[in-house]
Amino acid sequence: MDLPNDQLGRKIDEVMDVDAWMRAAAMHNLSGIGDTWWNAGLQHNLRLYVPQGGRGVVGLPWDLDFVFTGSATGPIKSAGGNLRRVMDIPTNTRIYYGHLLDMVDTVFNPEYMEPWLAHYGNVIDQNFSGRLSYIRSRSNFVRSRVRSEVPPISFSITTNGGESMSTEARSITLEGEGWVNVRSALLTRKSHMLLRLVSTEQFLFGWSISVPLVV
């Protein structure tokens, strides 16, 4: 973690499951969770899962007592310390913003959360409906801020100028551009491949993928 920024970007994937860390960080940010290492940089309320061999370490959410305590219009990057250094690596910023939008579009919105808040309120005899206002305001704010920080672009394939082509090779590498909501390619109805994200401080949105042409 003490490596210079350029070296950290090249080495961090060897020890951290960065994608999992960015998704957990997005959840903490959206939910306005206080008293936690993830948002406030406090030195507690973090657990680590270290797989055998020590690669792919995952940070686990822990002791989330103070939910919805952050401002609904607070920063969309609330991590500090070394996590913020990892998050600010261009590729990881792109991944993090993608997770924020994915959660806002799927689960962190009042339409999805209303029945769950009602359900768990009934289970413990409490009224959680007031939380919907925070969720609505926070999700709208985060969606707006992401679009402001990184304006949307259209998906495109830039290999061969985006034109059709033919090859006798057993695989081909395609390159292109895509916004933060582009992470994988559907090769068949049952097969997805993650794109290799190519991001720099000047341009976040490059991608490439090696596609097998012979089964």
Predicted segment positions?
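Catalytic-core segments of enzymes that bind and process phosphorylated/nucleotide-bearing substrates
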Residues: 1-156, 166
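Long, low-complexity serine/threonine/glycine- and acidic-rich segments characteristic of extracellular
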Residues: 159-215
